[in-house]
Amino acid sequence: MNVKGTPTRTIWPAREGGAVWIIDQTRLPHEFVTQRLNDLGAVAHAIRAMLVRGAPLIGATAAYGVALGMAEDPSDEGLTRACQTLLATRPTAVNLRWAIEAMAESLAAVPPDQRAQAAWAKAGAICDEDVALNEAIGDHGLGIIKDLARTKGVEKGGEGPINILTHCNAGWLATVDWARPWRR
């Protein structure tokens, strides 16, 4: 998504590393405010207080939370503690659990002195995967919408409108980034 002409994700790593930035969704729609999350506790608060919303974004945020936790304590106990802390923020959130389990599984065999770097890379990969999945969903959905428009004759002033119902939080703010086809 572009914010004032700048491509922006809903979560992104700080340039100097060691932190992530999020859009504080509690301030929308009246203000566009970003917040820097420097540690595991800040990430847990952001999830619990719903500064980030939407299943995919919550999962991505949790992945970066594990990475920040590994910067604090990369031991096996630190990994367990980071995962448990984040799981407690939204116990029923499916993507949160999935991301935490993916991080834990990926990091379990990594030596502790390499975990922070590996965790950061894995969290970034989870975010990139979310963008790719959303792009695939968008490509598929765009085809369906075009077919419906042709069927209804919308392009020639025929029946309309085409109604689209979303479930839960949908769109760019609920994900890391959204698919390109919706911007066409």
UniProtKB/Swiss-Prot annotation:
One of its GO terms (biological process) is L-methionine salvage from methylthioadenosine. SUPFAM superfamilies: NagB/RpiA/CoA transferase-like. It holds the Pfam family IF-2B. One of its GO terms (molecular function) is S-methyl-5-thioribose-1-phosphate isomerase activity. Belongs to the eIF-2B alpha/beta/delta subunits family. This is Uncharacterized protein in petC 3'region.
